[in-house]
Structures are given as structure tokens and as C-alpha cells.
Amino acid sequence: MQTQGVDISEHNGAVDFAALTQAGVKFAILRLGYGSDYASQDDAQFAQNVRKAEAAGMPWGAYLYSYAKDASMAQSEARHALRLLQGRKPLYGVWYDVEDSQIAGADLVATCQTFCAAMEAAGLYAGIYASLSWLTTKLNSPQLDPYDKWVAQWNSACTYPKPYGIWQYTDRLAIGGQVFDGNWAYKDYPAIIQAMGSQQEGANLTEADVKKLARQEMEAYFAELAQKPVSPWAQAAVESVLARGLMRGDADGSFRPQSFITRQEVAAVLENFS
């Protein structure tokens, strides 16, 4: 599969999400902000972009631009992301944007591991965004292989040799008078992330919880079944067996379905044999 998307920050100004949708854009990855957990470093448009994306029915992901030079700074950046997400689970994941020249000499493997582990501990899907050159040099570590990659390579094809999920192929995608970074996603992220959430929810259920849920579902089913009227095809048989005392209905005089083999079906059988 191949799905068109864009990434958006405050530098794009006020974005027309309706125009994006009309142009065939299926997802957006929104900048949370940059660096450590300071409100002054939040992306000024993040909250508004989330509202607009959701109003347009567009699934979104999020990214944080990193300045972390060590694990401690990466922890603060993780807190920054989690504060802004406020319990949301973006259907296109949370990405750690590792590209700034100031961190070129840092222990990038440690900072990426720290940030991504914090996202996963919060039940979020985590990945790493970087240029092709950084992914094949500074970030080319087996320790980062478990994390999804979003590859920035403005080219006619992505030549990253390892598995990746998203390719940022241009910074010149023009839509509705605005210019965006254009991306292709090669995974069904909403399905993956929703399934991941279901597994996490199921993993936290005790045996008693499972039994309680099953009982509630069964009770709801039979309660709904009990409210159904006699089916038209069984009406004559029901009236006949009631009149002859072959069967009895409910205390209120009604004769609703009550089980998988319903009494109205039994009535039809008795009518045929009597």
C-alpha cells in the first residue's frame, strides 16, 4: 500500500485541511514542538492543527524536533511530547526528529532509545525521522532496528536499505496555494496502532474482568432479544397454541423471543404437529 501524507508545523501557518483532503492527502504528521519540556518550545499551531485534522476526518501523527545531546535531555523531550499529547494516541505514531547539526556528535543511539522507549511505555507507537545520510551513518545501529523509520530523501526513489514505513520524498508539494513536505506511507498505521491498543487493553484484563465483560455482553444480547415482538411469520401459530393452552407466554401476556431456539419457533412446530 502507498498512502499520501504531509507533515506540518507552525511554519506552514494556517493550514486548510479541507484543501488537503480534496487533493488526496490521507494523513498529516504534526509538529509537537522542539527540544526540552518548556511551553515556550511548543509548536504554536499544534493544538489547532489537531482540531482541524480531526474535523476533516484525517488521521494524524506527531513529531518532536530534537536537540538532545544525552539521555537526560531526551527524557525531557519525551515529557514534552507526552504533555502535549495529553493521553491521545495518534494513528500515525509519534516520531523523534533527529537532524539538527548541534547534536551531530551526541550519543544519538542513546537519545533515540530513551525517547522511543518513553513513548512505548505510554502505549504509543514510536519511530525515528532522519535524513538518509544520518540513518545510514550516525543512526545505523542494530539497537535502533526495532524502531520504525521515517526517511527524508528528496528524490525519485527511496534508497534506504533497511525497512522503513514512511518516505518524505519532497519539500515542494504544492496544495491550495501552500507548500508542504510530501510523504508516502507504506504501512496501514491506523490499523496497526488500533490493533496495538486492543492488545494492550486485553493484556491488562484479569480473568474476572473477562468473565464480567462476557456476562454483560450476554445479558445485553438477551435483553435486546426479549424486547423483540413476535415475527409476522409466527403470529398465527402463536395465537393458535396460546388459545389451546399448548404454551404460555410471558407474565404480561406478551410472547417475545427469549433464546437461540425461540418460543415462537417452538409454537410453529407444535402448530404443525397438533
Can you name each region flagged by the protein language model?
Residues 73, 134-144:
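Glycine-rich, charge-decorated loop segments at or immediately adjacent to ligand/cofactor-binding or catalytic sites
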Residues 36, 69-70, 135-136, 257-258:
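Short secondary-structure capping/turn micro-motifs that flank functional sites
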Residues 1-125:
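Substrate-binding cleft of extracellular glycoside hydrolase catalytic domains
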Residues 64, 130, 153:
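Short beta-strand/turn micro-motifs composed of small residues
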Residues 123-136:
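Aromatic-lined carbohydrate-recognition surfaces of secreted/lumenal glycan-active proteins
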Residues 203-274:
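Short, solvent-exposed alpha-helical surface patches in non-cytosolic proteins
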Residues 1-12, 17-22, 140-205:
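Functionally critical loop-and-helix segments that line ligand-binding/catalytic clefts
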